[in-house]
UniProtKB/Swiss-Prot annotation:
Its main location: cytoplasm. The lineage of its organism: Eukaryota, Metazoa, Chordata, Craniata, Vertebrata. The modification Phosphotyrosine is found at Y278. Residues 190-281 are annotated as: SLA C-terminal. This is Src-like-adapter. Residues 7-20 have a biased composition (Low complexity). InterPro entries: Grb2-like, SH2, SH2_dom_sf, SH3-like_dom_sf, SH3_domain, SLAP_SH2, SLAP_SH3. Adapter protein, which negatively regulates T-cell receptor (TCR) signaling. Inhibits T-cell antigen-receptor induced activation of nuclear factor of activated T-cells. Involved in the negative regulation of positive selection and mitosis of T-cells. May act by linking signaling proteins such as ZAP70 with CBL, leading to a CBL dependent degradation of signaling proteins. It holds the Pfam family SH3_1. SMART domains: SH2, SH3.
Length: 281
């Protein structure tokens, strides 16, 4: 009934099961509710809410920042999965959220594309908000650049969080992440998203580069360590150095210095491709 607020005693309330009360049960507030023209807002744009129940068009939710509990219509919120996958918002609302005062460079979200049904868009905060279309292959793999394919969206986010690789910047934190309170318990080191990787390896001896021979085992892995211990960006930097310092017979010759490794989510392939192509949404 117009702008009237939802009754606090709904006739039918569907509590969410324990299996639903997970990471996906968050809502991002897209606009102040209720409107300031009617009464002081209970929930403000940019707040993240935990879902209590779903009533078909209305949500009963509690704010993660203020602790206030109330009802809010579905048109005023977007559903959030994994902290960065937003469902139910368009390009304009995505830009509004990414341009909130506390949002930093590199903040991002993935959302359903408005212009291409069945595809997704990656929206990133930089000097301005940039949008990149995410394509889906027939085998359900994803890519932004055709030379880099990923088995799932999580792998795509992980890769571009390590290296920009053609994007406007590296992905840093999901949009509105600052509105989620810090956990009270100590997270596991292997699951903490902000834990830096520390390598306990011998210092690399650059003099060994000149002794590398084409086709030798050392040329394949001059560090003689597991490649998985090094980030993609570090390995690419080493490859670039080798291409600049190696002689004509080196496996890393000069003509390869502008090329990069293909990353495929769960696998890394040693095939070389030309510079990436990106399609802005």
């Amino acid at each position: 009934m117009g702008n009237s607020m939802k009754s606090t005693s709904p006739p039918s309330e569907r509590p969410l099961s324990s299996s639903e009360g997970l990471e996906s049960d968050f809502l991002a507030v897209l606009t102040d509710y209720p409107s300031p023209d009617i009464s002081p807002p209970i929930f403000r744009r940019g707040e993240k809410l935990r879902v209590i129940s779903d009533e078909g068009g209305w949500w009963k939710a509690i704010s993660l920042s203020t602790g206030r509990e109330s009802y809010i219509p579905g048109i005023c919120v977007a559903r959030v999965y994994h902290g960065w996958l937003f469902e139910g918002l368009g390009r304009d609302k995505a830009e509004e959220l990414l341009q909130l005062p506390d949002t930093k460079i590199g903040s991002f979200m993935i959302r359903e594309s408005e212009t291409k049904k069945g595809f997704y868009s990656l929206s990133v905060r930089h000097r301005q908000v940039k949008h990149y279309r995410i394509f889906r292959l027939p085998n359900n793999w994803y890519y932004i650049s055709p030379r880099l394919t990923f088995q799932c969206l999580e792998d795509l986010v992980t890769h571009y969080s390590e290296v920009a690789d053609g994007l406007c910047c590296v992905l840093t934190t999901p949009c509105l992440a600052q509105n989620i309170p810090a956990p009270t318990s100590h997270p596991s080191p292997c699951t903490s998203p902000g834990s830096p990787v520390t390598l306990r390896q011998k210092t690399f001896d650059w003099k060994r580069v000149s002794r590398l021979q084409e086709g030798s085992e050392g040329a394949e892995n001059p560090l003689r360590v597991d490649e998985s211990l090094f980030s993609y960006g570090l390995r690419e930097s080493i490859a670039s150095y080798l291409s600049l310092t190696g002689d004509d017979s080196s496996s890393f010759d000069r003509k390869k210095k502008s090329l990069s490794l293909m990353y495929t989510g769960s696998k890394r392939k040693s095939s070389f491709f030309s510079a990436p192509q990106y399609f802005e949404d």
